[in-house]
Amino acid sequence: MPGAGLIKPNHADCGAFFIYDPVKKAVGLAHSGWKGTLGRIGANVVRLMQRCYGSDPKDMIASTSPAICKNCYEVDAPLAERFDDEFGAGVCTSPGREGHAWLDLEAAQAIQLIEAGLKCENITLMEKCTFEDEEHLFSHRRDTAKLGGTGDMAAYIRIV
């Protein structure tokens, strides 16, 4: 419906999924930090759009928001193992500190959208790191201790 929109406040290093179905004129939006990504929130939004709007994943267009990148997102070994088990080896790369690995959250997000039926060419990964872009983006990992508090970003999608 033109003019309809969704807003998702409160994400920082976590990403957001933006999903649009131009055929059914439907949108979906979800917060996708490590918990949501591991729980396949993107695929869940695709299924919800199928059920509620009759959307076909092949028609959907998806994008991710800025999020912490694979060069800056260090997680502990047990979490890295869960991601590799869920999405395949390579989502977590060479260990950082002992007992840790680097997590490619965007790769896991893309994998679940492709497995849910979206075409690769209809998925755009923002590839803008919240941790690295200090001038423009808030990063929970980078800024919370430095600022003595917290900050957030909001995501919004609207049919015009």
Which ranges hold each PLM region?
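Active-site microenvironment for binding and transforming phosphate-containing groups
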Residues: 1-160
